[in-house]
Amino acid sequence: MGQQISDQTQLVINKLPEKVAKHVTLVRESGSLTYEEFLGRVAELNDVTAKVAAGQEKHLLFEVQPGSDSSAFWKVVVRVVCTKINKSSGIVEASRIMNLYQFIQLYKDITSQAAGVLAQSSTSEEPDENPSSVTSCQASLWMGRVKQLTDEEECCICMDGRADLILPCAHSFCQKCIDKWSDRHRNCPICRLQMTGANESWVVSDAPTEDDMANYILNMADEAGQPHRP
């Protein structure tokens, strides 16, 4: 019976527009993801990106933000920090924070791309060819994807309008969609997290300023404990 329902659900998803189907699949996957599987994916991304970017000047480091996964509702509050680091100096060049939904998107993008790159390298007629030569700086390209995911947040309902409101559970929506929903409901349309009051329910999402980002990156560099050697 369960398998039949699952097959029917997949059939419906297959008939949806590609963009909406991808969103539904990601939401379903994040809902069934266990904490151990999540930690495994963070470790896997570190391994995969290290292999593909071997021999390059920069690399990415994925870490769960300390304290963000301690709640019983870790899926709505957990944050993954993606940091681009210069290997020779240890200096943090860029840093971004992702929620679980954004992380799963990135995980799928990177593992899919990396599989192709590593397969191409293994079948190359020149075995000495470095897989990292496929791109000049793979870490920078991936960091650009992280920036796109965290900057261009779309409404979780219509998948069209730019999100300008974010709930405490980190799901974001455009003003038009959330106005219609909040007229009758006091919970999140995606995860159903209950909102306690009008003042706490709908929080305007403000992008960090350049000063905020600069201070954050400097703090990350200090915590890395590796001084810059010009």
From Swiss-Prot:
State a single Pfam family of this protein. zf-RING_2
The record, for SUPFAM superfamilies, names: RING/U-box
Q: Which domain of life is it from?
A: Eukaryota
What are this entry's molecular-function GO terms? ubiquitin-protein transferase activity; zinc ion binding
How does the protein's chain sit in the membrane according to the entry?
A: Lipid-anchor
Q: Where is the lipid attached (N-myristoyl glycine)?
A: 2
| Tissue-wise expression | Isoform 1 is testis-specific. Isoform 2 is expressed in heart, brain, skeletal muscle, kidney, pancreas, lung, liver and testis. Isoform 3 is expressed in heart, liver, and kidney.
Main location per the UniProt record? membrane
Q: Which InterPro entries match?
A: RING-HC_RNF141, RNF141-like, Znf_RING, Znf_RING/FYVE/PHD, Znf_RING_CS
UniProt KW keywords: Lipoprotein, Membrane, Metal-binding, Myristate, Zinc, Zinc-finger
Q: Which CDD domains match?
A: RING-HC_RNF141 (cd16545)
One cellular component (GO) term of this entry: membrane
Question: RING-type zinc finger positions in the chain?
Answer: 155-192
Localization recorded for this chain is: Membrane
Give GO terms for biological process. Answer: protein autoubiquitination; regulation of DNA-templated transcription
What this protein is reported to do is described as: May be involved in spermatogenesis.
Protein name per its UniProtKB record: RING finger protein 141
Organism (species): Mus musculus
